[in-house]
């Protein structure tokens, strides 16, 4: 494999970290895709949840693509790994799925924070700026949004409450 002419101040550990983050984002996308089509089933039938999780899946895939583009820009090499299967196939109620989604977003956020710490330890200001401007603020917003949804789903309860939340909150947003 040839060495990139574009490479400058790009540590091998940072390059490997970007590849791990690509995998993490693709795993999140894969998990959200599973959630989306669970809520699209005829025996679940919550189209707002389907739409919300499908949008989340697309967003995570876009994050992976952004990281791949960045890897190439810095002269790194993209090394894809196997994407782990989501932890489950059945996602339960909307509340349960949102709780899983919140944990997933917190895991992605922690991975990004670890990557930020790594690139900072190698004095890579460009990568730190990239992570801050493209990912970290968005993660905080996503965690807050999911937390709000969980609070409201607890408030309205399962059954009819969840159905109304699906119609009034999720179908009208994104």
UniProtKB/Swiss-Prot annotation:
Catalytic activity: 4 Fe(2+) + O2 + 4 H(+) = 4 Fe(3+) + 2 H2O
Every Ferritin-like diiron domain range: 8-157
Principal cellular location given in the protein's record: cytoplasm
Keyword Cytoplasm belongs to the record: yes
Binding annotation for Fe cation 1: 25, 60, 63
Sorted UniProt keywords: Cytoplasm, Iron, Iron storage, Metal-binding, Oxidoreductase
GO molecular function: ferric iron binding; ferrous iron binding; ferroxidase activity
One GO term of the biological process aspect: intracellular iron ion homeostasis
InterPro entries cross-referenced by the UniProt entry: Ferritin, Ferritin-like, Ferritin-like_diiron, Ferritin-like_SF, Ferritin_CS, Ferritin_DPS_dom
Coiled coil: none
Known EC number: 1.16.3.1
Entry keyword annotation includes Transmembrane helix: no
Cellular component per GO, a single term: cytoplasm
Tissue-specificity statement: Expressed in somatic tissues but not in oocytes.
Record's subunit section: Oligomer of 12 or 24 subunits. The functional molecule is roughly spherical and contains a central cavity into which the polymeric mineral iron core is deposited.
Annotated function: Stores iron in a soluble, non-toxic, readily available form. Important for iron homeostasis. Has ferroxidase activity. Iron is taken up in the ferrous form and deposited as ferric hydroxides after oxidation.
Family designation: Belongs to the ferritin family.
Protein's UniProt name: Soma ferritin
């Amino acid at each position: 494999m040839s060495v990139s002419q574009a490479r400058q101040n790009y540590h091998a550990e940072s390059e490997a970290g970007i590849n791990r983050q690509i995998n993490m984002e693709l795993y999140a996308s894969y998990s959200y895709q599973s959630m989306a089509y669970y809520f699209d089933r005829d025996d679940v039938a919550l189209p707002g949840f389907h739409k919300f999780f499908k949008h989340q899946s697309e967003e995570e895939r876009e994050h992976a693509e952004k990281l791949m583009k960045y890897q190439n820009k810095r002269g790194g090499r993209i090394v894809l790994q196997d994407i782990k299967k989501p932890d489950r196939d059945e996602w339960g109620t909307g509340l349960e799925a949102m709780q899983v989604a919140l944990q997933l977003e917190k895991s992605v956020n922690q991975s990004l924070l670890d990557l930020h710490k790594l690139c900072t330890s190698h004095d890579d200001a460009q990568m730190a700026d990239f992570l801050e401007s493209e990912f970290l603020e968005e993660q905080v917003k996503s965690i807050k949004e999911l937390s709000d949804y969980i609070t409201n789903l607890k408030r309205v309860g399962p059954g009819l409450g969840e159905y109304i939340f699906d119609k009034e909150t999720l179908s009208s947003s994104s």
